[in-house]
Amino acid sequence: MMNKVDQIIGYKKYEVKLPKDRQVKKNKSKGGNVDQIDTKREKDKMRAFGEERKKFLDKMAKNKKKNTSRKDREKPKEVEKENYKREDKRLKEQKKLSLAKEFRFKEPNSEAINQNTAAENGKPKPQTGLDFDIDHQTVSKIMIDQAIQTSSPLNVQLTELFNDNVLDVSKDSQFVLQDMEFTSWERRWSNCSTTSNATTVSSVPDPKYNINYNDITSFNSVALITEDLNISASSNGLHERGKKLLQQEMEYSNKVKNVTIGLERLCMDEKPVPDAGITMQQASRWSEFPTCCDQAAI
């Protein structure tokens, strides 16, 4: 209701019209503003998009953190696994090297080995021209000791054949020093056997085997031959003495070849060799115990 002042001045209430580009169209059917509804819808969409984007970014950050922590946890395991493989490989290589340096079997009498090794160290150096050095002789010694302890039938045969006691002679006799020309095979067996541990050698043959090992005369690379004083210094006497020396050398050499070839066949074929002076039962026992046959040099 208009007051008196308005009635006096004739005041008339009116609306200010905006330009068309700024005018707001009304939706008479819905009784609302179309632009306002659209703006609200856009704001809702933007708000929803922002919320979804935030959730997505949070999820990505969470997954990244989770993956990083998993890698951190798995990294020590991978490093430990690689270290284990590397260490295992190193141990295997070291084991191969140690096996290559070790002997094929262990010496049962370790005290005898230590004593004999100390005795060997105190001995003078071997003569020049030998096929084996000191280290190789030590290896051969332990191998032949094992054969002596485990296979007694060849015990006396080897010791009688290769010990250092040469021909027994009287003090009044004069000697002729003669070098025997051994082959490399004979010298190799001689060197292998002369280093045998004397403390483990039995001087009595096994009674189960009816073999006379003493018929093989002992010898070394240097043989002392007795000079018969009754033989004159004439050419005939020298000839007879030379024939005697040659006969003894040939006899010893043939015995060496007989034994070494027999042992070689046993090592290679593992079959009894009757022509080598070894019985069938003895040959089968010998083939069970590797000795010098295991050496690569032979």
From Swiss-Prot:
GO CC annotation, single: nucleolus
Subcellular location as annotated: Cytoplasm; Nucleus, Nucleolus
Induction line: During sporulation. Expression is activated by IME1 during meiosis.
Source domain of life: Eukaryota
Disulphide-bonded residues: none
GO terms, biological process: meiotic cell cycle; negative regulation of pseudohyphal growth; sporulation resulting in formation of a cellular spore
Location of the region described as Disordered in the Swiss-Prot/TrEMBL record: 18-91, 109-128
Entry keywords, A to Z: Cytoplasm, Meiosis, Nucleus, Sporulation
Disruption phenotype: Impairs sporulation.
Family: Belongs to the ZC3H13 family.
Protein's job: Component of the MIS complex, a complex that mediates N6-methyladenosine (m6A) methylation of meiotic mRNAs and is required for initiation of meiosis, progression through the meiotic divisions and sporulation. In the complex, mediates the entry of the MIS complex in nucleolus, where methylation takes place.
Description of how the protein assembles with itself and partners: Component of the MIS (mRNA N6-methyladenosine (m6A) methylation) complex, at least composed of IME4, KAR4, MUM2, SLZ1, and VIR1. Interacts with VIR1.
Protein name, as recorded: Sporulation-specific with a leucine zipper motif protein 1
Upper classification of the organism: Eukaryota, Fungi, Dikarya, Ascomycota, Saccharomycotina
The encoding gene: SLZ1
